[in-house]
């Protein structure tokens, strides 16, 4: 049985430009009959080579929600087991989140950088919706 996920993004501001900003977009995403929904809260660190793997290519095309729940550390997302922050595709500061499509052709890792600041408490909440 196919299921549907409906993401909505709204951006508003009254002072970022001379004109008021008000953008809202919605989509309807079909997840398919064999979809996997993986929900976890993890402590990504720099001890494991490349951090913690949060997505494996065997899932195929997916939609990923990720939120940095750590109070002080930035969480980096990268498609390779590499804790160099310059190799990261995304950096989520404390409280920041992202929802994005993932082609599923490479793995996805989360880490807190190569500076020895492993996250001792949960720092990344993520959900993978397989398309």
Where are these regions (language model features)?
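Buried hydrophobic-core signal for structured, non-transmembrane domains
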Residues: 61-67, 108, 125
């Amino acid at each position: 049985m196919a299921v549907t996920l409906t993401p909505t993004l709204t951006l508003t501001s009254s002072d970022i430009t001379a004109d008021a900003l008000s953008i809202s977009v919605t989509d309807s995403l079909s997840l398919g009959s064999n979809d996997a929904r993986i929900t976890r809260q993890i402590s990504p660190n720099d001890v494991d080579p490349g951090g913690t793997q949060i997505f494996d290519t065997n899932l195929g095309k997916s939609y990923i929600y990720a939120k940095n729940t750590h109070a002080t550390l930035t969480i980096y997302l990268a498609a390779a087991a590499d804790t160099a922050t310059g190799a990261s595709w995304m950096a989520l500061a404390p409280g920041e989140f992202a929802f994005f499509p993932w082609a599923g052709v490479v793995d996805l890792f989360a880490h807190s950088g190569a500076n020895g600041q492993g996250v001792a408490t949960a720092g990344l909440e993520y959900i993978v919706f397989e398309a």
